[in-house]
């Protein structure tokens, strides 16, 4: 049975619930957010309305997505300067339903250790499984991960050979996480991937991806295809994790390098009193 979200930090935030282009195909979309049924409709004057059975919700359109909130948003939608770069393919990477907590998806996205095992031939390969030390810090209430280099045989569709790829992560909100990754051609510049995770309920979510890739030697279709291939490799791993909720309960923390991001992320969630989609001490 779906439970009610009482986490003010989550409720008073903006969440993606659909792509704007979906309303070009049908005038009404039914979906869920935090266990609540919501309807997205295009009005006769072309305005977009989002509502539950008992109230109209706030709505914003940004980056080609429809955003709403069940509460009273206290923060703006995140700023993405890369979305304004004319030298980039700026596109949706698609929406995928995953039968696990949205918090699990964020933690998996941050996990360096799985790349060689889950994405061989793309994001890693044996024997290149060593995780060098890296930096994790919290700045302005966001998590930043830097000083990461990982060998990848095919870091993107534009890759012609394997190389050490510079990585950075940024966790903006509990359900919004981005990756900056060295471009395969212009290695001194970064491609950008962000996941906007829509919690259907505590154990199911829809992952909306937004891609800002430098356009050298690649097409929009290739960029989207690559993202979908990688994510479909992750999906069964995520859906087979037990429990589906992310454990935040106190436990002994083994100081393994690849776990450092996870430990910081879980502590950060605890500090924000996040319970929805998590197993906590409370």
Kindly label every feature range from the protein language model:
Residues 2-90:
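Rieske [2Fe-2S] iron-sulfur-binding domain
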Residues 1-2, 282:
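Short, Lys/Arg-enriched, disordered terminal segments
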Residues 74-282:
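C-terminal catalytic domain of Rieske-type non-heme iron oxygenases
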């Amino acid at each position: 049975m779906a439970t009610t979200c009482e986490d003010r930090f989550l409720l008073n935030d903006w969440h993606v619930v659909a792509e704007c282009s979906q309303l070009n195909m049908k005038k009404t979309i039914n979906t869920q957010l935090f266990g609540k049924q919501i309807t997205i409709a295009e009005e006769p004057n072309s305005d977009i309305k989002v509502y539950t059975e008992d109230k109209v919700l706030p709505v914003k359109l940004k980056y080609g997505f429809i955003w709403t909130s069940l509460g009273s948003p206290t923060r703006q939608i995140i700023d993405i300067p890369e979305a304004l770069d004319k030298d980039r393919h700026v596109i949706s990477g698609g929406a995928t339903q995953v039968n696990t907590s949205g918090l699990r998806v964020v933690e998996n996205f941050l996990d360096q250790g799985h790349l060689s095992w889950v994405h061989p031939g793309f994001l890693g390969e044996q024997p290149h499984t060593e995780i060098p030390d890296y930096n994790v810090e919290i700045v302005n209430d966001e998590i930043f991960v830097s000083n990461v280099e990982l060998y990848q045989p095919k870091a993107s569709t534009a890759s012609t050979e394997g190389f050490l790829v510079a990585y950075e992560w940024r966790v903006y909100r509990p359900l919004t996480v981005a990756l900056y990754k060295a471009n395969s051609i212009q290695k001194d510049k970064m491609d950008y991937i962000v996941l906007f995770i829509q919690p259907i309920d505590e154990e199911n979510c829809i992952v909306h991806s937004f891609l800002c890739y430098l356009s050298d030697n690649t097409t929009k279709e290739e960029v989207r295809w690559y993202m979908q291939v990688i994510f479909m490799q992750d999906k069964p791993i995520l859906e087979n994790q037990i429990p589906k909720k992310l454990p935040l309960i106190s436990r002994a923390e083994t100081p393994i390098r690849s776990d450092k991001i996870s430990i910081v992320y879980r502590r950060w969630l605890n500090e924000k009193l996040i319970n929805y989609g998590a197993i906590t001490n409370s």
